[in-house]
């Protein structure tokens, strides 16, 4: 059996945009050839693609990172750099991608979802030609692609989730009402991964998941614990199956333990529509235990079945279908806020430090953005770099630090001597 992996962390690195270049036409018989430096190509994106044929994140297990190709640099003669090749990764339906605890993508369909945006290609000097500057020696580097540590979580998607204590009959019930061939045995924790099945009821159908058995303390991680409680969150209806046929079992205690675990894990989960199923009606003492339960919980409606003998299963399917139909009329659950991947945005801030006399260092997201965007390879680019720093207030702030001509200023790995002119 394939290993069930439903949570991993890895780094996503989209492609960097290609750099624009400085170039001028140099052709025989062409007098005063103008600028012809082309733009860099866009960096490749990373997409996750929903695949109903997958039910685990095993294919991503062991990967430290997923990357896309960088864009190609521009060329002379106004040649645009090629776009970097995007990367497409197939993942199970129900996969969620988080960045700094914010939801980036919720894969609920068989389609492509953008999870990391490629960088923008830098402009070549042909784009900077104007009436005032007919021979610009200005170009831009491509911007970095989006890079972050992704927290990837799989929550199995099904209409109905079957929950209960170990050996309550969950797998037997799934096999009896659906097309699933679940593993069944007379020992606890037979089900180690969620099992999915399709249930047909008259002209309708719905999906059911058999989830690993819950024990006291599951919400704190005991047994298979929190790892599988999260899968129930995706279900629209919860079927709680209880063993009413065994003398050593306590149906009331089992009912209360499961409800407490759901409540402690998530109030939203505990409030989902629920069908309580009394299993093993074929065994002696069943009816007596049902009556004791009803005396304690007269308002809890239960469906009496025997999963192994396939007794009263049509009534159960009808009850589930009715609740599913009623659930459609309820307000939709609030979705987690999704972070838009339109463009990498940086804050407009910077910091000036003066660790010792005659030395100043400028750091911050906005400074890095400008520095990486403008390659300091020509006088015109230096002028543009200087102008942008002046525009955001860096030079005025340096004067407040009483900077003097001859002092050293460092911006990342670029150092220059302050001459008092800007």
Swiss-Prot record:
<dbReference type="InterPro" id="IPR036726">
    <property type="entry name" value="GTP1_OBG_dom_sf"/>
</dbReference>
<dbReference type="InterPro" id="IPR006169">
    <property type="entry name" value="GTP1_OBG_dom"/>
</dbReference>
<dbReference type="Pfam" id="PF01926">
    <property type="entry name" value="MMR_HSR1"/>
</dbReference>
<dbReference type="GO" id="GO:0000287">
    <property type="term" value="F:magnesium ion binding"/>
</dbReference>
<dbReference type="InterPro" id="IPR015349">
    <property type="entry name" value="OCT_dom"/>
</dbReference>
<dbReference type="InterPro" id="IPR036346">
    <property type="entry name" value="GTP-bd_prot_GTP1/OBG_C_sf"/>
</dbReference>
<dbReference type="GO" id="GO:0005525">
    <property type="term" value="F:GTP binding"/>
</dbReference>
<feature type="domain" description="OBG-type G">
    <location>
        <begin position="158"/>
        <end position="325"/>
    </location>
</feature>
<dbReference type="InterPro" id="IPR045086">
    <property type="entry name" value="OBG_GTPase"/>
</dbReference>
<comment type="subunit">
    <text>Monomer.</text>
</comment>
<feature type="domain" description="OCT">
    <location>
        <begin position="334"/>
        <end position="420"/>
    </location>
</feature>
<keyword id="KW-0479">Metal-binding</keyword>
<keyword id="KW-0547">Nucleotide-binding</keyword>
<dbReference type="GO" id="GO:0003924">
    <property type="term" value="F:GTPase activity"/>
</dbReference>
<feature type="binding site">
    <location>
        <begin position="164"/>
        <end position="171"/>
    </location>
    <ligand>
        <name>GTP</name>
    </ligand>
</feature>
<dbReference type="InterPro" id="IPR031167">
    <property type="entry name" value="G_OBG"/>
</dbReference>
<comment type="function">
    <text>An essential GTPase which binds GTP, GDP and possibly (p)ppGpp with moderate affinity, with high nucleotide exchange rates and a fairly low GTP hydrolysis rate. Plays a role in control of the cell cycle, stress response, ribosome biogenesis and in those bacteria that undergo differentiation, in morphogenesis control.</text>
</comment>
<feature type="binding site">
    <location>
        <begin position="279"/>
        <end position="282"/>
    </location>
    <ligand>
        <name>GTP</name>
    </ligand>
</feature>
<feature type="binding site">
    <location>
        <begin position="210"/>
        <end position="213"/>
    </location>
    <ligand>
        <name>GTP</name>
    </ligand>
</feature>
<dbReference type="Pfam" id="PF01018">
    <property type="entry name" value="GTP1_OBG"/>
</dbReference>
<comment type="similarity">
    <text>Belongs to the TRAFAC class OBG-HflX-like GTPase superfamily. OBG GTPase family.</text>
</comment>
<keyword id="KW-0378">Hydrolase</keyword>
<feature type="binding site">
    <location>
        <begin position="189"/>
        <end position="193"/>
    </location>
    <ligand>
        <name>GTP</name>
    </ligand>
</feature>
<dbReference type="InterPro" id="IPR006073">
    <property type="entry name" value="GTP-bd"/>
</dbReference>
<dbReference type="InterPro" id="IPR014100">
    <property type="entry name" value="GTP-bd_Obg/CgtA"/>
</dbReference>
<feature type="domain" description="Obg">
    <location>
        <begin position="2"/>
        <end position="157"/>
    </location>
</feature>
<feature type="binding site">
    <location>
        <begin position="306"/>
        <end position="308"/>
    </location>
    <ligand>
        <name>GTP</name>
    </ligand>
</feature>
<keyword id="KW-0342">GTP-binding</keyword>
<feature type="binding site">
    <location>
        <position position="171"/>
    </location>
    <ligand>
        <name>Mg(2+)</name>
    </ligand>
</feature>
<dbReference type="Pfam" id="PF09269">
    <property type="entry name" value="DUF1967"/>
</dbReference>
<protein>
    <recommendedName>
        <fullName>GTPase Obg</fullName>
        <ecNumber>3.6.5.-</ecNumber>
    </recommendedName>
</protein>
<dbReference type="InterPro" id="IPR027417">
    <property type="entry name" value="P-loop_NTPase"/>
</dbReference>
<keyword id="KW-0963">Cytoplasm</keyword>
<feature type="binding site">
    <location>
        <position position="191"/>
    </location>
    <ligand>
        <name>Mg(2+)</name>
    </ligand>
</feature>
<keyword id="KW-0460">Magnesium</keyword>
<dbReference type="GO" id="GO:0042254">
    <property type="term" value="P:ribosome biogenesis"/>
</dbReference>
<dbReference type="InterPro" id="IPR005225">
    <property type="entry name" value="Small_GTP-bd"/>
</dbReference>
<dbReference type="InterPro" id="IPR006074">
    <property type="entry name" value="GTP1-OBG_CS"/>
</dbReference>
<dbReference type="GO" id="GO:0005737">
    <property type="term" value="C:cytoplasm"/>
</dbReference>
């Amino acid at each position: 059996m394939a290993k069930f992996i439903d949570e991993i962390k890895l780094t996503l690195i989209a492609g960097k945009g290609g750099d624009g270049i400085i170039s001028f036409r140099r052709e025989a018989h062409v007098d005063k050839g103008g600028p012809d430096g082309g733009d860099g190509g866009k960096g490749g994106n990373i997409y996750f693609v929903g695949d109903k044929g997958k039910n685990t994140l095993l294919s991503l297990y062991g990967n430290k990172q997923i990357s896309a190709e960088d864009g190609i640099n521009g060329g002379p003669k106004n040649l645009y750099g090629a776009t970097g090749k995007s990367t497409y990764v197939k993942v199970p339906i129900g996969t969620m991608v988080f960045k700094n605890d914010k939801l980036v993508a919720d894969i609920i369909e068989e389609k492509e979802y953008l999870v990391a945006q490629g960088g923008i290609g830098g402009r070549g000097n042909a784009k900077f030609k104007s009436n005032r500057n007919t021979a610009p020696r200005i170009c831009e580097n491509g911007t970095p692609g989006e890079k972050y540590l992704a927290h990837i979580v799989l929550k199995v998607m099904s209409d109905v989730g079957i929950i209960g204590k170990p050996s309550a009959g969950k797998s037997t019930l799934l096999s009896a009402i659906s097309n699933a061939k679940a593993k069944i045995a007379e020992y606890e924790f037979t089900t180690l991964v969620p099992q999915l099945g399709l249930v047909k009821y008259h002209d309708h159908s719905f999906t059911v998941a058999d989830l690993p058995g819950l024990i006291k303390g599951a919400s704190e991680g005991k047994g298979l614990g929190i790892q599988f409680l999260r899968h129930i969150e995706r279900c629209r209806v919860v079927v709680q199956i209880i063993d009413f046929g065994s003398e050593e079992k306590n149906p009331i205690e089992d009912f209360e333990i499961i409800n407490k675990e759901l409540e402690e894990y998530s109030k939203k989960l505990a409030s989902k529509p629920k069908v309580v199923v009394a299993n093993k009606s074929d065994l002696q003492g069943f009816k007596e235990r049902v009556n004791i339960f009803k005396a304690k919980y007269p308002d809890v409606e239960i469906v009496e079945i025997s999963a192994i003998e396939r007794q009263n299963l049509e009534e159960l399917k009808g009850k589930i279908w009715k609740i599913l139909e009623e659930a459609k009329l309820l307000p939709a659950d609030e979705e987690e806020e999704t972070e838009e991947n339109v463009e990498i945005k940086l804050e407009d801030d910077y910091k000036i430090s003066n660790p010792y006399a005659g030395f100043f260092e400028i750091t911050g997201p906005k400074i890095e953005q400008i520095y990486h965007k403008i390659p300091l390879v020509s006088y015109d680019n230096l002028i543009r770099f200087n102008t942008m720093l002046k525009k955001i207030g860096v030079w005025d702030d340096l004067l407040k630090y009483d900077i003097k001509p001859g002092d050293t200023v460092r911006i990342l790995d670029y150092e220059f001597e302050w001459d008092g002119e800007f």
